[in-house]
């Protein structure tokens, strides 16, 4: 499904929070949305593999990487796993790598930057916790919508026709 965050903000201006414009699109889908699962991990993506093994239909993985752009939390292998398990998208408060490969995959990916250095994989982090970045507080179960214009968040799913 295609989402237009500008239109959604016009219709639901009192029901949505707008994330500060820190992110760029890196995935093959330019718009995506769904129910979020939160994860907090700093320069370590081991926990992401476990989460992305789950069925992702209708879901978006929201990764609080502490805003670090020193190591990429998302790479082509992780993004392919997410695509295979039907995740709608990934939002990373951090960096990605292998951007040409990411652009070929049918998944939405938004991140702050790209860098060739990979993250550790020790599995250090927490999931399903409250995270805060971009002027917004995110809870697992909230609903996120993203496109080239921006990212918005709603507590409940928006009625989109």
Swiss-Prot record:
Organism whose genome encodes this protein: Pectobacterium carotovorum subsp. carotovorum (strain PC1)
Location in or out of the cell: Cytoplasm
Name used for this protein in its record: Regulator of ribonuclease activity A
UniProt GO molecular function: endoribonuclease inhibitor activity; enzyme binding
GO CC terms of this entry: cytosol
Alphabetized Pfam families for the sequence: RraA-like
Subunit-structure text: Homotrimer. Binds to both RNA-binding sites in the C-terminal region of Rne and to RhlB.
Key words of the record: Cytoplasm
Domain of life per record: Bacteria
């Amino acid at each position: 499904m295609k989402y237009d965050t500008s239109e959604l903000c016009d219709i639901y201006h009192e029901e949505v929070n707008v994330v500060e414009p820190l992110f760029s699109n890196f995935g093959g889908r330019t718009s995506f949305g769904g129910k979020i699962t939160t994860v907090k991990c700093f320069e370590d993506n081991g926990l992401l593999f476990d989460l992305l093994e789950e069925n992702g239909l209708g879901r978006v993985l929201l990764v609080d990487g502490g805003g670090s752009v020193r190591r990429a939390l998302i790479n082509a292998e992780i993004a392919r796993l997410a695509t295979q398990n039907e995740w709608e998208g990934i939002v990373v408060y951090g960096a990605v790598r292998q951007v040409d490969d990411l652009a070929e995959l049918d998944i939405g990916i938004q991140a702050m930057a790209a860098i060739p250095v990979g993250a550790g994989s020790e599995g250090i982090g927490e999931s399903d916790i409250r995270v805060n970045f971009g002027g917004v507080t995110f809870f697992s179960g909230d609903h996120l919508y993203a496109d080239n214009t921006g990212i918005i968040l709603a507590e409940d799913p928006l009625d989109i026709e």
